[in-house]
Amino acid sequence: MNNAQFKIECFRNGLYSPEQIIEFYKVVHTEETKYNSRDAQLWINGKSSREYQIDLKAIQIVDMLNAIRSEVIAKEKERIELGNPRYKYLFKGEQALWSEHQEFINLPVNFYNSIMVELGKKDLIYFEFSKKDIES
């Protein structure tokens, strides 16, 4: 995967900035990493005169997100065809997303939102916590 492909795949999966890429990298690979947002910037932009080597674990993260994305989209399309969609909301933050859909725990809210865009969902509303949810 070259730098341009990596950038498009990151954007496709809701990782829009070098900081978001490194933050998610650290979620997946909990051991200490030597990489920072400057490295991620080079992974997505390359160097002016040549391609920049992308860390293999970063590529594996993109591949993992693509696999999850494909599975979620396929299942939701089946539910839509049956008239029983599961995903009906947009979320303003990860905690709300994770409380409603445990299958997205530790995934960025932008990942979920990008799936909604790809599914062509236009009738979504924002998810709001009820008072009961906040108290429990």
Predicted regions, residues:
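Alpha-helix boundary/N-cap detector
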Residues: 1, 53-60, 107-110
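A short, Lys/Arg-rich alpha-helix, primarily the initiator
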Residues: 1-20
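Secondary-structure-rich domain cores
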Residues: 10-11, 22-25, 50
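Residues within the helices of the helix-turn-helix
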Residues: 19-22, 38
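Recognition helix of helix-turn-helix/homeodomain-like DNA-binding domains
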Residues: 26-54
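Residue-level detector of alpha-helical secondary structure
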Residues: 44, 62-66, 77
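DNA major-groove recognition helix of helix-turn-helix/homeodomain DNA-binding modules
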Residues: 50-71
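Helix-turn-helix/homeodomain-like alpha-helical modules used for DNA recognition
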Residues: 70-136
